Amino acid sequence: MTEELKNRLLSILKFVFAAVLFIAVVATLYHELAHINFKQTLEAFSKINRWYLVGLFICGGSAMILLSLYDLILVKGLKLDIPLIRVFKISYIINALNAIVGFGGFIGAGFRAFIYKNYTTDRKKLVHAISIILISMLMGLSLLSILVVLHIFDASHIINKVSWVRWILYVVALFLPLFIAYTMINPIDRNNKYLGVYCTLVSSFEWLAAATVLYLSTVIVDINIAFTTVIGIFIIAALSGLVSFIPGGFGAFDLVVLLGLKSLGVPEEKVLLALLLYRFAYYFVPVIIALILSTFEFGSSARKYFEESKYFVPARDVTSFLFSYQKDIIAKIPSFALATLVLITSFVFFINNITIVYDGLYDDHHFAYYIMLSVHTSACLLLLINVRGVFKQSRRAILFVMISLVLIFSATIYTYASLILLSWILLIFILLILAYRRSKVMKRPFRLKRLIFTIILSMLVLYVNHFIISETLYALDIYHIEMDTSLLKYYFWLTILVVVILVGIVAWLLGSRYTRPHQLEDLSRCKSIIETYGGNYLSHLIYSGDKDVFMHEAQQAFLMYRYKGNALVVLGDPIGDTKAFQSLLIDFYNYGEKLGYDIIFYQVSDRFMPLYHNFGNQFFKLGEEAIIDLTQFTTSGKKRRGFRATLNKFDDLNIQFEILEPPFSKDLIFQLKQVSNQWLDGRNEMHFSVGQFTEEYLQQAPIGIMKNEEGKVIAFCTLMPTYYNEAISVDLIRWLPDLDLPLMDGLYLHMLLWGKDKGYKAFNMGMATLSNVGQLNYSYPRERVAGRVFEHFNGLYRFQGLRKYKEKYSPNWEPRFLVYRKDSSLWYSMLKVMRVIRHK
């Protein structure tokens, strides 16, 4: 059998053992809890003095401080240059987390290695010291097991009934002398020969502190058992929890304590309540404190400290890849901690809905209580659905949570007025104020799938909330008010109404300030950039008047875009110095992220696809643009006789083509307006990706016109200078629809010949939408569906047959793409673009 196979079999056996043990513990615990009267448990809890609870929670939070001595010994032994206050804070955070998800202390050991490696160059010595701390956590129990064997702590009622427990205590007790001997023979260095002894003593005090918290929990619920007996039961229960490999010993520890106290004649209801208080005081309270400390201890300052550490610099090249992720994780700890606190707050106050209903049932002012219940529930729901927003440091989410806390605070004062909970709300509110001031993101981009998920989650949470309230009241056999005479039957809809009102108010407050950003009245700088660095096929549309401009900080490049529907839709590629494009996009994406806007690029070329890809985008091919090589274009030859026939027909009708330079007279504008109105036939102008018929736009470039023999304009096209690849393009092409003449062909042919005569090398005929898009069976279904929507719901222009029409000019086809974020929906992004194009 190979070594690899042995290790694999050993891992499987460990997993099977842990799983079987866990199932057995759960089954036994379920059997024991099935006989418990939960009504009596709740009644016993309601009779507990609240100040006793506060004292217990303080003891639980303080007990974790003893574990900081591990880190103090470590820092002093290795002579690490860390302020003591920082050591205590980091240690408290590590130990609180380790208590919940410790897996035998490995989580805590990993965090210690992660934090302290930046303060030493001798990583081997650090790992050795941490391993001693890890093992010594068990040695404390070994020392206490010796005291149980010596009957200093009394567990005889368990040992006498279950004989194999005695042998487990003997075996565990033997670990201590072996560990002490090993650490003294193989110390980390000469100066730390007694490190194992010191850590064992710390471990012993820590286990005794935890046992004391359990004893105080039993005292509070009126269990009269001697201190030494409770400690003895605790030690055996702690050993059971360690053997189970379950984080925190959940299940195994509780089962042993339950059976141990039950064998002494203690009612199960009291034991359950004592265990719940112990778990809350020794595990939950320290985690809360650790989360609060994390919001201050980690972040930009800690990140900067690690980056500037003299021990980190030499290893930067070696570990830069891993460290790049580690420092990002450290920076996110404060927001994660605050989001967790908000989540806990939401759950706690959802549970307190039971108290409001209970008080309302016995109060004469039922309506006031149930209105408060709706407000309270709405606020709790807003806390829950904004947890992710708080983690993402969204100001809007933080503002939602702050408003929700104000409502919960008001409802709490009116109803059950718990001083502990009111203090908790104030603490979280202060943390949120600090987070709001640090936040640089106004809101997160809107996502339809996120909205659907939020609605489903909200409905589910409200249903579960109602179910828990009704089942709790039923289980407690509490008097019920008739639903027909109570406002309680409208509770669900009142909650929805309050949520909608709150969301609407906050959305309006934030949204009204950021609707048309970066409007630019003076386009002279844009014109200068185009003349200096060149433009593209769409750069002339800067003069259409329906776009905003995002300018590069050094004014070397810019973007044309439009704000619509919580999105910034950019037209084409950036314009200007290509060397400035990356920094321009970084600034633009930072700006969009700050305000919570989606960023979509429309009709971009494939020149800068790698650049767009770097920003986490994906692509959809919109179609292909027809580019005619004017150096090869001709009307001569057999294949071009159709072109010659068209031109000859216009000559026979004495229809003339002419290029006019601006400025244009009022009379000409009036004639062009008449042609445009008849061509539109009551339809609205399109926007954004094409120009509109406005005098300001027409005055920016030459216009090609076709006149009949009376000199009346019957067709026209507006030129689009590109300052790019010696190319020319046209924008508006309009003619009198009543005339049975191929006027569009005539305009194109005359423009092609004119452009060739003027020395241009390329002519852009525009895009054939969905050309070669979603045509194969292997194409993404969503792309084919989105392409059909984009094609059939764009009513002004007909794209069917457009490629076939342009093919007769023998163009070269260049692809054009839609660029959108990878976490955004394709069809929803295209709908946003359509809104921009179809609405001014």
Curated annotation (Swiss-Prot):
Q: Single GO cellular component annotation?
A: plasma membrane
- Per its UniProt record, what InterPro entries does this chain match? Acyl_CoA_acyltransferase (IPR016181), L-PG_synthase/AglD (IPR022791), LPG_synthase_C (IPR024320), PG_lysyltransferase (IPR051211)
Q: Which UniProt keywords apply?
A: Antibiotic resistance, Cell membrane, Lipid metabolism, Membrane, Transferase, Transmembrane, Transmembrane helix, Virulence
Spell out the SUPFAM superfamilies in the cross-references. Answer: Acyl-CoA N-acyltransferases (Nat)
- UniProt-listed Enzyme Commission number(s): 2.3.2.3
Q: What does this protein's UniProt record list under function?
A: Catalyzes the transfer of a lysyl group from L-lysyl-tRNA(Lys) to membrane-bound phosphatidylglycerol (PG), which produces lysylphosphatidylglycerol (LPG), a major component of the bacterial membrane with a positive net charge. LPG synthesis contributes to bacterial virulence as it is involved in the resistance mechanism against cationic antimicrobial peptides (CAMP) produces by the host's immune system (defensins, cathelicidins) and by the competing microorganisms (bacteriocins).
Q: What is this protein called?
A: Phosphatidylglycerol lysyltransferase
**Source organism per UniProt:** Staphylococcus haemolyticus (strain JCSC1435)
Q: Which gene encodes it?
A: mprF
